[in-house]
Each structure stands twice: as structure tokens, then as C-alpha cells.
């Protein structure tokens, strides 16, 4: 989406 994609550690 319009959100900035960070590498999720979960």
C-alpha cells in the first residue's frame, strides 16, 4: 500500500 515497507522481524 502507501505504507513504507520495513523488514518485519516477526
UniProtKB/Swiss-Prot annotation:
Q: What does this protein do?
A: Plays a key role in hydrogen peroxide removal.
Listed GO molecular functions? L-ascorbate peroxidase activity; metal ion binding
Where it sits in the cell: the answer is:
Cytoplasm
One Gene Ontology term from the biological process aspect of the record: hydrogen peroxide catabolic process
Additional free-text comment from the UniProt record: Binds one cation per subunit; probably K(+), but might also be Ca(2+).
Q: Which domain of life is it from?
A: Eukaryota
Give the protein name, as stated in the record.
Answer: L-ascorbate peroxidase, cytosolic
What family is reported? Belongs to the peroxidase family. Ascorbate peroxidase subfamily.
Q: What is its EC number?
A: 1.11.1.11
Which reaction is the catalytic activity of this chain? L-ascorbate + H2O2 = L-dehydroascorbate + 2 H2O
Q: Which organism is it from?
A: Pseudotsuga menziesii (Douglas-fir)
State the GO CC annotations. Answer: cytoplasm
EC class name: oxidoreductase
| UniProt keyword list | Calcium, Cytoplasm, Heme, Hydrogen peroxide, Iron, Metal-binding, Oxidoreductase, Peroxidase, Potassium
Co-factor(s): heme b
This entry's comment on the bound cofactor is:
Binds 1 heme b (iron(II)-protoporphyrin IX) group.
Amino acid at each position: 500500500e502507501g505504507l513504507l515497507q520495513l523488514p518485519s522481524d516477526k
